[in-house]
A protein has these predicted regions:
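Cofactor-binding active-site loop characterized by glycine-rich and histidine/acidic residues
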Residues: 14, 21-141, 162-166
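Membrane-interacting alpha-helical segments
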Residues: 6, 83-86, 156
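Thiamine diphosphate
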Residues: 141-191
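Cofactor-/ligand-binding subdomain signature composed of acidic, glycine-rich
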Residues: 1-25
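Acidic-residue sensor for enzyme active/binding pockets
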Residues: 10, 33, 150
Length: 191
């Protein structure tokens, strides 16, 4: 899937949301397509991918068919998409997938399975205690878990750098999330 296809899918979801066809929250992406495509070149079918509530692009890049993904979103599950047969899981709980990723990494290592675990988290989630503990555990036990921090410079509606006041020491990619608000698609839709 290329960047144009990702954007077209997300645009369709935004239109459906604004038309009141999705009676649940949606968290849409825009501007991070090329970064994710680059990362997913190294993600294999046997690898696990874990994400936060903003996971439409990751699902598509992991191989979930667009119509299957769209059906789950229309059913109100946009922020907790789970497709075990494609080895992709997400959660609306901030940092909720991080300990699961560590557990999957332990399982992969113990079973000697030829798989990796890729976990995507936001810039503010990366500053939580659970994130630091999970990253340290992965490092200490040499688990096959890779953390991808998606830094859109905002945590909900707060500028992340202003709220934390520090210089980052982690490997991140950054993008401007200017097309969509934190939740929704720009129109106020009553459920």
């Amino acid at each position: 899937m290329n960047a144009e296809q990702l954007v077209a899918f997300e645009t369709e979801i935004a239109e459906l949301f604004n038309a009141g066809k999705i009676a649940a929250p949606v968290h849409l992406s825009h501007g991070n397509e090329e970064n994710l495509i680059r990362i997913f070149k190294d993600v294999r079918p046997q690898d696990w991918v874990l994400c936060s509530w903003r996971s439409h692009y990751q699902c598509l890049l992991k191989g979930v068919p667009p119509e299957e993904l769209k059906a789950e979103i229309l059913a109100g599950r946009s922020i907790a998409l789970n497709f075990p047969k494609y080895r992709i899981l997400s959660s609306a709980i901030v940092g909720g997938v991080l300990p699961i990723a560590v557990g999957l990494g332990m399982g992969v290592q113990l079973s000697r399975e030829n798989a990796k675990v890729h976990v995507f988290l936001g810039d503010m989630t990366a500053e939580t205690g659970v994130a630091h503990e999970c990253m340290k555990y992965v490092q200490n036990f040499n688990l096959p878990v890779y953390f991808h921090i998606e830094d859109n410079n905002q945590s909900v509606c707060t500028d992340t750098q202003k709220s934390w006041g520090f210089v980052s020491h982690t490997d991140r990619f950054s993008y401007n999330a200017t097309k969509y608000p934190h939740a929704g698609a720009g129109e106020r839709v009553q459920f």
